[in-house]
Amino acid sequence: MSRYRGPRVRIIRRLGTLPGLTNKIPQLKSSSINQSTSNKKISQYRIRLEEKQKLRFHYGITERQLLNYVRIARKAKGSTGEVLLQLLEMRLDNIIFRLGMAPTIPGARQLVNHRHILVNDCIVNIPSYRCKPQDFITIKNQRKSEAIISKNIEFYQNSKIPNHLTYSSLEKKGLVNQILDRESIGLKINELLVVEYYSRQA
C-alpha cells in the first residue's frame, strides 16, 4: 500500500488529532451522528485497525514499512510496542518535525528529500534514516535552506521540544540526547493494539 496523499482533514475526522500529518484540529461531529455511532458495537478488529492507521498516517509511512518496523521490534529486547514507537520516533523526518524545523512530518520529509538537512555534517536525503543518541542535525549552509527552516522554527518553537531532543537557535542545531521514553511520544496511541493487529503477520 502506497503512502497516503489524499485530503488530510478527512483522516483526522475519522481518527482524531494527528500532529505529524497536519496541524489542523478535527471538527467535532454533530451529536446525532455521535449518538448513532455510540449505539453501534465496535468490533475489536476495528479498534486495532484504527490504532494501526493512526500510526501509519501520523508518521506518514506505508503499510509495508509499518509491518517491517513491527518485525524489527519483535526481535528486539523489551516491550514490542515501546520499541516500535522508538523506531518510528527516531526516524530522521520525525526528529526534524519534533525539533520544530518543519510544521508536519510530510514537510520534514520534503526538507530531507531536497537535501536541506545534514546529520553529523553529512547530507542525508533518506527520511527513514534512523537517528541515534549524540547525532546532531543541522541545515545546509545555503540561504534558501536557512530561510525555509528559520521560518518554521520561529513559528513552531512555541511547542515543547521533548526531553530526548535539544535545539540551539543560536547554532541552528538539533541534538538527539538519548532514546526517548514512552512519555515523550507526541501522539495519543495504544501501541499494544497495533502489535495485536499484526500478531498473525509479523
UniProtKB/Swiss-Prot annotation:
<comment type="similarity">
    <text>Belongs to the universal ribosomal protein uS4 family.</text>
</comment>
<dbReference type="GO" id="GO:0003735">
    <property type="term" value="F:structural constituent of ribosome"/>
</dbReference>
<dbReference type="GO" id="GO:0019843">
    <property type="term" value="F:rRNA binding"/>
</dbReference>
<dbReference type="Pfam" id="PF01479">
    <property type="entry name" value="S4"/>
</dbReference>
<comment type="subunit">
    <text>Part of the 30S ribosomal subunit. Contacts protein S5. The interaction surface between S4 and S5 is involved in control of translational fidelity.</text>
</comment>
<keyword id="KW-0934">Plastid</keyword>
<keyword id="KW-0687">Ribonucleoprotein</keyword>
<dbReference type="GO" id="GO:0042274">
    <property type="term" value="P:ribosomal small subunit biogenesis"/>
</dbReference>
<dbReference type="InterPro" id="IPR002942">
    <property type="entry name" value="S4_RNA-bd"/>
</dbReference>
<feature type="domain" description="S4 RNA-binding">
    <location>
        <begin position="90"/>
        <end position="153"/>
    </location>
</feature>
<dbReference type="GO" id="GO:0015935">
    <property type="term" value="C:small ribosomal subunit"/>
</dbReference>
<dbReference type="Pfam" id="PF00163">
    <property type="entry name" value="Ribosomal_S4"/>
</dbReference>
<comment type="function">
    <text>One of the primary rRNA binding proteins, it binds directly to 16S rRNA where it nucleates assembly of the body of the 30S subunit.</text>
</comment>
<dbReference type="GO" id="GO:0006412">
    <property type="term" value="P:translation"/>
</dbReference>
<keyword id="KW-0694">RNA-binding</keyword>
<keyword id="KW-0699">rRNA-binding</keyword>
<dbReference type="InterPro" id="IPR022801">
    <property type="entry name" value="Ribosomal_uS4"/>
</dbReference>
<comment type="function">
    <text>With S5 and S12 plays an important role in translational accuracy.</text>
</comment>
<keyword id="KW-0689">Ribosomal protein</keyword>
<dbReference type="GO" id="GO:0009507">
    <property type="term" value="C:chloroplast"/>
</dbReference>
<dbReference type="InterPro" id="IPR001912">
    <property type="entry name" value="Ribosomal_uS4_N"/>
</dbReference>
<dbReference type="InterPro" id="IPR036986">
    <property type="entry name" value="S4_RNA-bd_sf"/>
</dbReference>
<dbReference type="InterPro" id="IPR005709">
    <property type="entry name" value="Ribosomal_uS4_bac-type"/>
</dbReference>
<protein>
    <recommendedName>
        <fullName>Small ribosomal subunit protein uS4c</fullName>
    </recommendedName>
</protein>
<dbReference type="InterPro" id="IPR018079">
    <property type="entry name" value="Ribosomal_uS4_CS"/>
</dbReference>
<keyword id="KW-0150">Chloroplast</keyword>
